[in-house]
Design a protein with these regions (language model features):
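Interaction interfaces in information-processing and related assembly proteins
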Residues: 11-230
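N-terminal amphipathic/basic-hydrophobic helices that include classical n-h-c signal peptides
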Residues: 1-11
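Cys/His-clustered metal-coordination modules, chiefly Zn-binding fingers
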Residues: 201-277
Length: 277
């Protein structure tokens, strides 16, 4: 990394996304770390380790993909299947606020730790949705497959976008992720992309957890000229509000509300994302 390209990005920072480019090759990349967001979600939802790992992968993947968007919007990643886990969802809004959740098919079902948490979803689909501030949402769907969520995301870009894409997601020590993607219309060539992908595949979970983007990229790609952009802050934030709760209640049938009041004496609504009441 030439000194004039680096800037003041050498300190490890919590909850950031950081873009970089291999300008001579027409390849872009994204780096994310979500330490505080992950800690907040784990405190709110004491998920089994396998479910927590899958949610961490979903959050990292969604944050990485949101950094590649050409236009502003809310990106939602959802993987749903017929397994013990019904679905995992991660959302990144245009304000760079994140939230996510895991849904179980049976709240009491055992969920043993496994090396490939994606397998707890069984057969299913990965859905990527982009909701722009105005206009209709854009949605892409691909079948789940492979051992990791990254496999399904890579397959989506291969089938739907025809863009060579690789992701590395880590939930061993917090949540981090790395993405490489050929630029649309670029002339990187398959050999150039594969060379970088092979080099990036040597990354270790400990390196992702402990190294800032500058140090990590210098270690993985010591001979390449990389332009590293300033970090963008990311944060856990829910969209629930008293106003939205009132709108939900107003949409319910009066008879239903009266029945709840007769049985419980009050109406309690809890946000499934942040547990606010």
């Amino acid at each position: 990394l030439p000194k004039d390209r680096i800037g003041k990005n050498s300190m490890v920072q919590n909850d950031i996304g950081q873009r970089f480019h291999f300008e001579a090759l027409g390849i872009r990349g994204e780096y994310v770390r979500l330490d505080q967001t992950w800690a907040a979600l784990c405190a709110l939802h004491p998920y089994p380790s396998a479910a927590a790992a899958l949610l961490g992968e979903a959050l990292a993947a969604a944050a990485l993909l949101s950094g590649t968007l050409k236009y502003p919007g809310t990106l939602t990643l959802q993987a749903a299947g017929d397994g013990a886990l019904r679905a995992v969802m991660a959302e990144v809004r245009e304000t760079r606020a994140l939230r996510g959740i895991v849904r179980f098919r049976d709240d009491d079902a055992a969920l043993p730790p496994i090396a490939a948490p994606l397998n707890h979803l069984g057969e299913g689909l990965l859905t990527l949705t982009l909701r722009p501030p105005k206009g209709e949402p854009h949605q892409g769907i691909v079948r789940l497959g492979g051992d990791h969520l990254a496999d399904a995301v890579e397959r989506y870009f291969e089938q739907s976008e025809q863009l060579p894409t690789r992701l590395w997601l880590s939930t061993t020590h917090g949540v981090q992720g790395l993405l490489l993607q050929a630029l649309p219309g670029g002339d990187c060539g398959s050999e150039g992309f594969e060379r970088l992908a092979i080099m990036a595949s040597t990354v270790k979970d400990q390196e992702l957890a402990e190294l800032d983007a500058q140090t990590l990229l210098k270690r993985l790609f010591p001979e390449d000229d990389i332009r590293l952009h300033p970090p963008r802050p990311l944060a856990f934030e829910c969209t629930c509000s008293r106003e939205r709760t009132q709108e939900t209640l107003a949409a319910m049938a009066p008879d239903t509300l009266e029945e709840i009041l007769r049985e419980d004496g009050e109406i309690l609504m809890t946000c499934q994302f942040c547990q606010a009441r």
